[in-house]
Every structure is written in structure tokens, then in C-alpha cells.
């Protein structure tokens, strides 16, 4: 493994260590119920100050590594070429909001000055990730560990537009949980100016929130079964809807009918853990139930949505909620050997996934390693 991989390993270790100093267990439930982010008191307590300081440190490290990169990612130079086309007012397939920002930055910093553009999107993407952890991460350090080892941060060095939209979607979950649906829709619409795929989360997150607070009846299961059947028998209709928004995906390399077995396995394992913890953690806990239904939706998409181009990206909008659900389930389990085994299993599985991810980062279609930055390279 190349030495620059130690940058990613060290970043994960140091940020998770900083995350240990963030104690959010009491603040998150209050915030989701409508309270302040760090409690009700306007005068910061010592713990609130520690939370802010540690979280700011996490942000600086994550943003720094991302913003200072150069030639990292298989689409880095593709984006650079698109930046030039945008500055020339040529047609590109990216959304109007993204194009506006790119053109503005080149007007300010000069034609083909691409480093500030990548840095800006890095700073914004990491901001939404960290704010989501602050607002919803009852167990901040563990959620951060899952975010890092699950690849959501490192993959944001690729596919800049998509991962910014994913970070906005993660951030916007809190508004669904708080019942502030207008804010949720506005944030999603803002994200759609960067990547239209985020529009998917409006019906998906609202459906998960409805089911989380409802007592399931027979008609819920009938509707669910009907939707499942539609994914099997109405694939042509769904494909036409997708190609209306993304016509260049038709018959492209992304339209390959690929099944993501790793993500299917992740969803199945999470749902098994949910079944084990149902009485203690899912019965009346709306947050946990919301995340549970998102993972259930993700499993359905991965199992029945192979006709969707880039199906993994569609599913990520749902299964990224695992970074909040798993720590809550594990913490609420009764102390004993089963809890210790579950902690070890989750940490070990994500750790192994991270190791495999590091090995794959050298692949031509990923190219996240070697890590280069414009300061030293």
C-alpha cells in the first residue's frame, strides 16, 4: 500500500479521536424535538464549548485534506475540462447552480483557475457532513467513524456534485424529524441546483417519516407490496422518468444492470440488528424508526432496482442513515455479551470495508490514491 494512504488512515484516526470529546447524547434528542443545537441555555457550558471546539477541529481536518487535493479522483481532470467549457458558455450536462458557481469563481480568480473551485465545493460538502453529525449524531465519534470507514467522506473527493447533494440530504434529515417540512423541501431544492438526483429524497424521506410515526395497518403493507411489484413489472416506466432528467445515462457505461451485493449485505445486517433491538429501540422511537425505514427502502432499491443507472448512488441517499442508526441501536442494547459482540461486529465490518476501500483506491476508475496536494506536490 502506497505511503500516502497513511494520510487517509491518519485522518480517520485523528478525527474520530477528536469526536470522542463531543458528547451529544443529551443534546440531540432535545434538538430534534425543537430545542437548541447545544441545549437550551444561551450561556455555553464547558461541555457545549468542548463540543463546538472538537467539531470545529474535525471540520478543519476533513476540509483541509479535501480542499488541498490535486489530481485526486478519476474525474478530477474531467471536472477541470468542464470548468473550462462552462467559462466558455459551452453546453455541459451539469446543473445550472453548479455552472453558475463555477463561472463565478473563474470570473473572480481567472480562467482555468480550478483549485479554488474544488476547494469551495470541498468546504461546503464537509460543512454539511459535520453539521449533520452535530445535529443528529447522538454518539458523534461512532457516527464519524462510520462516515469515514463507510467511504462517504473519501468518495466525496470524486463525484463532487453528487456527494455535495448527498451531504445536503443527510443534513436535511433533521428537518423531516423536526416536522419542519418547508425547510426540508427548500434545502433539497437548493441541492437540486447542484445535482437533480437529490429530488428523490422528498418522497422517500417523507414516506419514511410518515411510517415512523404511524401504527402500521393492512393498507400500508398493500401499498408497499404494490410499489415493490411496480419495481419489478414497471421498470420501463421508471427508466423513462430517469432518462427524462438524465438522458445521457441511456445506454451509457453506468446503465449496466449492476447489483451492489455489498450494500445489500449491509442493509440485511442492519435490519437483522433492528429486529434484535426492536422492543428496546424501535417500538416507540421515531428517530430510530425513521432511519430503519430508510434502510428498508435502501434494501428494496438495491434488490429490485438494478435497472436504475448508478443504483448505488440512489441507495446511498437512504442507507447513509446507518451512521446514525447503528450507534443508537448499539448504545440502547442491554449490557452484556450480545452488546459487546454487536459492537465488535459493526466496528470490525466497517473497518474491513475501509481496508478493502483503500486497496481499491488505486483502481483507474477510482484513483483516490496516491493522495497529492498543491502544498507539497
Identify the residue ranges that each predicted region occupies:
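Short hydrophobic/aromatic helix or loop-helix immediately within or flanking a transmembrane segment
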Residues: 77-111
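Loop-to-helix entry region of an early transmembrane alpha helix in multi-pass inner-membrane enzymes
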Residues: 96, 110-124
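Alpha-helical transmembrane segments and terminal signal-anchor/GPI-anchor hydrophobic tails
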Residues: 72, 77-80, 92, 99, ...
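Transmembrane-helix signature of polytopic, membrane-embedded enzymes
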Residues: 130-149
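Membrane-interface transmembrane helices that cradle and orient dolichyl/undecaprenyl
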Residues: 169-182
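Short acidic/glycine- and proline-prone juxtamembrane loop motifs at membrane-interface regions
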Residues: 157-163
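Membrane-interfacial, low-structure loops and terminal tails that flank and connect transmembrane helices
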Residues: 27-51
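Membrane-interface alpha helices of multi-pass inner-membrane proteins
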Residues: 152, 183-207, 299-303
